Amino acid sequence: MKTLYSLRRFYPVETLFNGTLALAGRDQETTGFAWWAGNARLINLSGKLLGAHVAHAGLIVFWAGAMNLFEVAHFVPEKPMYEQGLILLPHLATLGWGVGPGGEVIDTFPYFVSGVLHLISSAVLGFGGIYHALLGPETLEESFPFFGYVWKDRNKMTTILGIHLILLGIGAFLLVLKALYFGGVYDTWAPGGGDVRKITNLTLSPSVIFGYLLKSPFGGEGWIVSVDDLEDIIGGHVWLGSICIVGGIWHILTKPFAWARRALVWSGEAYLSYSLGALSVFGFIACCFVWFNNTAYPSEFYGPTGPEASQAQAFTFLVRDQRLGANVGSAQGPTGLGKYLMRSPTGEVIFGGETMRFWDLRAPWLEPLRGPNGLDLSRLKKDIQPWQERRSAEYMTHAPLGSLNSVGGVATEINAVNYVSPRSWLATSHFVLGFFLFVGHLWHAGRARAAAAGFEKGIDRDFEPVLSMTPLN
């Protein structure tokens, strides 16, 4: 079962580096890969590959638990989360754990529980990983045919795909259940400055949910990143979970159609490239989502978005100068446009100055001051509440910008708060990881296609240039 076909046919890339180091029969000679090629040695050893994946999951979950407890240990309830360099607690707070009105943390115990549960889970996964890597069967096909597979078995591969889709669908429904029945989630739009609430009136209309996918990605539209109410987010998860589960069942019950059998490459490396491509897309979408969206990523926990900080500064100075007697409705700025307020090309009243580029920002502290034609002058003169002033002054000084030059007019003098926004971290890290995953997708897709076409030869190791060079020492 292990050697259904010539290893040289499917691994023609010669990778001799240190052929003498043998690891439990998984050496260069038997696999075509040297020790440093990592899991490539395990391509046809389903049991050992399972061990590697379970151990990897254990490392991931261990990091989550340890980092979670580290953040709990360092957490100062009197300071905003986004001032403390936290990247995990904001996610737990967004799910409604431990927070009250205005995003104030009232109980850190749920965060502690989360960390401990992840640590315990990681121990179980770590044990399973070590067991399958060292003690379990090398291949699962003989003893546990349900869990065994051969990479070119198209029907088995789509069955595995189906199982994964069902698990993803269940994950989507876990969020739905939390929002509907288990305490609700944090809603930054709740009246008075945000609160935890149960989401009862879900948006299930397909025209609304799928309308997001048909929107333009540009300003004022913003594709799915423009979602700004939790009913749509949770309703979207109902749709997504249902599609994943139905699609998973379909993939388990069916075999690939002829066009799919012809169009796709059916090898382990090809599946790796497909997965990396998908993860890359997820990374780029997540980057835009965390950078621009303050509903799924509330500013109370992640800090303001870039546009939000810029608009908050314009609002703060409008409030100040209006108190000092300025007529904010008619004051002219240095360019001849309105200094505080101006009209957009389509006629709405928007903030003037450099922040005009962020005219389409929506934020809970600003929306009450809008009327049917944009910002309402009479509300700006009579209805501004103290909490809106405090919130905007706080956001103005916590822009997620570092020290960029083009910052939408935000004052970034060097005496500002020593501060890196978690929004910056999360957006940047997901962009960078998305890019690396995309490069990995191209690399493995190219190798998989070349191997399938039969012309991947690799370097001729007998006459490799480095062999004739003098040693470095």
From Swiss-Prot:
The modification N-acetylthreonine is found at residue 15. Keywords: Acetylation, Chlorophyll, Chloroplast, Chromophore, Manganese, Membrane, Metal-binding, Phosphoprotein, Photosynthesis, Photosystem II, Plastid, Thylakoid, Transmembrane, Transmembrane helix. GO terms for cellular component: chloroplast thylakoid membrane; photosystem II. One of its GO terms (biological process) is photosynthetic electron transport in photosystem II. The chain crosses the membrane at residues 69-93, 134-155, 178-200, 255-275, 291-312, 447-471. Binds multiple chlorophylls and provides some of the ligands for the Ca-4Mn-5O cluster of the oxygen-evolving complex. It may also provide a ligand for a Cl- that is required for oxygen evolution. PSII binds additional chlorophylls, carotenoids and specific lipids. It is a multi-pass membrane protein. SUPFAM superfamilies: Photosystem II antenna protein-like. The modification Phosphothreonine is found at residue 15. Pfam families: PSII. InterPro entries: PS_antenna-like, PS_II_antenna-like_sf, PSII_PsbC, PSII_PsbC_sf. It is found in: Plastid, Chloroplast thylakoid membrane. [CaMn4O5] cluster binds at residue 367. Disulfide bonds: none annotated. Its main location: plastid. Residues 1-14 form a propeptide. One of its GO terms (molecular function) is chlorophyll binding. Belongs to the PsbB/PsbC family. PsbC subfamily. NCBIfam families: psbC. PSII is composed of 1 copy each of membrane proteins PsbA, PsbB, PsbC, PsbD, PsbE, PsbF, PsbH, PsbI, PsbJ, PsbK, PsbL, PsbM, PsbT, PsbX, PsbY, PsbZ, Psb30/Ycf12, at least 3 peripheral proteins of the oxygen-evolving complex and a large number of cofactors. It forms dimeric complexes. One of the components of the core complex of photosystem II (PSII). It binds chlorophyll and helps catalyze the primary light-induced photochemical processes of PSII. PSII is a light-driven water:plastoquinone oxidoreductase, using light energy to abstract electrons from H(2)O, generating O(2) and a proton gradient subsequently used for ATP formation. This is Photosystem II CP43 reaction center protein. The lineage of its organism: Eukaryota, Viridiplantae, Streptophyta, Embryophyta, Tracheophyta. The gene is psbC.
